[in-house]
Amino acid sequence: MNTLEKARHFIYKNARPLELATWQYHFENGSKEAVLNALGFYQNEDGGFGNGLEADFLNPNSSPMATWAATETLREIGLTDKNHPIVKGILRYLESGEHFDKKQNKWLNTIPSNNDYPHAIWWEYSEESDNISYNPTAALAAFIISYADTKSAIYEKGLKIAKEAVEWFVSSAPINDNHDVSCFIRLYNVLDGEAIITEDM
């Protein structure tokens, strides 16, 4: 049994339907629709994601971090349909202001209700801890810029956050947190591809 076969065996034995559909998409000519159907079970009525999508915390409530995880799946399968219900739902959740700190202009990376459900210690919410950073805010801003109507309020919000994020990154480099860096990579790819830094910022 070669490495690919071992990986396939592991996936089929252990994976959730979402990861199985993603595997099939990449290696077995599976469809985007199958991935999206599996992903949709984690989406709540408010458009955000929870329900253990980010497997380190099983909070059923929508959170910025679980919603970010959903955007990573959409990126992975190359979804370009800006009118897809999952995309529309995510934008609705982000526009709602839920779990958004207006003073810092960032989404929380841990939320209070995390503590009510099984979770890894790093997802514990505490008012004393630093639960606001550009993880996942920078990546969520990238998602907004990629998918929102350019004339919408949420698009303008995404641009404002992106501008502040870039300014913070330039003044704070080097960044030692790999999670923050990965979110900035998402943002860079969007800003570089659409020349928004010079045109709109």
Which sequence ranges carry the predicted segments?
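Hydrophobic, aromatic-enriched interface-forming segments
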Residues: 137-201
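Terpene synthase/cyclase
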Residues: 12-32, 43, 47, 60-64, ...
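Long, well-ordered core segments of solenoidal/helical folds
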Residues: 6-15, 34-48, 85-106, 151-174, ...
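Generic N-terminal targeting/processing segments that precede catalytic cores or assembly contacts
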Residues: 30-35, 39, 52-56
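Structural helix-adjacent loops and short alpha-helical linkers that scaffold large soluble proteins
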Residues: 1-5, 19-34, 77-88, 147-159, ...
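Solvent-exposed loop and edge beta-strand segments that line ligand/cofactor-binding
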Residues: 1-15, 24, 53-67, 122-135, ...
